[in-house]
């Protein structure tokens, strides 16, 4: 139960904390869209598609707003809730713990253990004279 609660807390915090980091890495900064970034390419494509301007409410405009001003409190609560649910689900999955290593049987061959005698070196070197 504690593992699941810890995973939920980590998932919620990660979801809220990752948004500004990812947006900043894409180029949506507090000072505007960074030059030569993914955000600049997105803005250029949106402007070309709309005949020269970026329309209000578009994905680029929304991401620019979030990058400059941050998310609202309700958006942070929603992100934390979704992240907590995902974290709890992933923390409860059986694949998150390491499986027990199977024990080797005595009559099975083991890796990196010599099974017989090593090959014998040649008795003399053979040189071919011409």
From Swiss-Prot:
Name a single GO cellular component.
mitochondrial membrane
Is the keyword Mitochondrion assigned to this protein?
A: yes
Query: What keywords are annotated for this sequence in UniProt?
Result: Apoptosis, Membrane, Mitochondrion, Transmembrane, Transmembrane helix
Matching entries from InterPro entries are given as: IFI6/IFI27-like, IFI6/IFI27-like_sf
Membrane-spanning parts: 8-28, 43-63, 66-86
What is the protein's given name?
A: Interferon alpha-inducible protein 27-like protein 2
Give the encoding gene's name: IFI27L2
Superkingdom of this protein's organism: Eukaryota
Query: Which species is listed as the source?
Result: Homo sapiens (Human)
